[in-house]
Design a protein with these regions (language model features):
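Non-catalytic C-terminal interaction segments of nucleic acid-processing enzymes
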Residues: 2-12, 121-133
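Acidic-basic catalytic patches of nuclease active cores, encompassing PD-(D/E)XK
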Residues: 5-56
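Nucleic-acid nuclease catalytic cores
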Residues: 78-83, 92-126
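Amphipathic coiled-coil/heptad-repeat helices and related helical stalk/stem segments
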Residues: 58-59, 84-87
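Short amphipathic alpha-helical segments and helix-helix/interface helices
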Residues: 41, 88-89
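Conserved catalytic cores of phosphodiester-cleaving nucleases, focusing on short active-site segments
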Residues: 65-78, 91
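Short glycine/proline-enriched coil/turn segments at helix->beta-strand junctions
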Residues: 45-49, 67-70, 94-98, 116-117
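Catalytic centers of nucleases
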Residues: 56-68
Length: 133
């Protein structure tokens, strides 16, 4: 949990740069969740986007990646939409998070805004299909 100090990963970030890095991902047919974490971390590094991995927003609220006010949460498969929405609400209730990008393997419907903050869903299966082994 950042107490207001400036760090390399909490400088304001351009969401479009983050989305460009994420849309370059090509997932194999059955990646594990931590394989997806590794791929996302590598995509951010290749794009020159500093980030914090497993960032603690508050007690019991640890988002997968934090990039200057933008959170990125990764879910393998097709998560339960209701549970995912509750998790997104908990994260977006934190002042430090201005918006969230949810990366899922399968399309999972989420509202465009939660608590007045933008929610963007990136489906890996829609990024030109899944790369077969």
């Amino acid at each position: 949990m950042n107490r207001g100090g400036y760090s390399w990963y909490n400088a304001p970030m351009d969401t479009q740069e983050i989305l460009r890095a994420l849309t370059a991902l090509r997932a194999s047919a059955m990646p594990g969740e931590y394989d997806l974490h590794r791929m996302v971390a590598e995509a951010f590094k290749a794009a020159g986007l500093p980030c914090a991995h497993e960032y603690r927003l508050a007690p019991h609220r640890r988002i997968d990646f934090f990039l200057g006010g933008v959170g990125v949460e990764i879910k393998k498969g097709r998560p339960n939409a209701r549970q995912l929405l509750r998790q997104v609400e908990r994260y977006l209730a934190c002042d430090e998070l201005a918006e969230i990008i949810v990366v899922t393997q399968k399309v999972t419907p989420l509202p465009a805004r939660v608590l007045g903050k933008r929610v963007t869903n990136v489906s890996l299966d829609r990024l030109w299909g899944v790369a077969l082994p």
